[in-house]
Amino acid sequence: MQVNDLGFIATILFVLVPTVFLLILYIQTRKETEG
């Protein structure tokens, strides 16, 4: 099975972007709750 480079990059971005976004939100809320 040949891997389509564009599809592979799109899949990585599709997974990575929401994960990074959630991590940033999580860290920001933790800093606020810690004071």
Swiss-Prot record:
Cellular component terms per the entry's GO annotation: photosystem II; plasma membrane-derived thylakoid membrane
Membrane association type: Single-pass membrane protein
Primary location class: membrane
Subcellular location as annotated: Cellular thylakoid membrane
SUPFAM superfamilies: Photosystem II reaction center protein M, PsbM
Swiss-Prot/TrEMBL GO biological process terms: photosynthesis, light reaction
UniProt key word ATP-binding: no
UniProt KW Glycosyltransferase keyword: no
Superkingdom per UniProt: Bacteria
Record keywords, A-Z: Membrane, Photosynthesis, Photosystem II, Reaction center, Thylakoid, Transmembrane, Transmembrane helix
Transmembrane segments: 7-27
Family according to the record: Belongs to the PsbM family.
PANTHER family, sorted: PHOTOSYSTEM II REACTION CENTER PROTEIN M
HAMAP family per the UniProt record, alphabetical: PSII_PsbM (MF_00438)
Subunit structure comment from the entry: PSII is composed of 1 copy each of membrane proteins PsbA, PsbB, PsbC, PsbD, PsbE, PsbF, PsbH, PsbI, PsbJ, PsbK, PsbL, PsbM, PsbT, PsbX, PsbY, PsbZ, Psb30/Ycf12, peripheral proteins PsbO, CyanoQ (PsbQ), PsbU, PsbV and a large number of cofactors. It forms dimeric complexes.
Job of this protein: One of the components of the core complex of photosystem II (PSII). PSII is a light-driven water:plastoquinone oxidoreductase that uses light energy to abstract electrons from H(2)O, generating O(2) and a proton gradient subsequently used for ATP formation. It consists of a core antenna complex that captures photons, and an electron transfer chain that converts photonic excitation into a charge separation. This subunit is found at the monomer-monomer interface.
Protein's name in the database: Photosystem II reaction center protein M
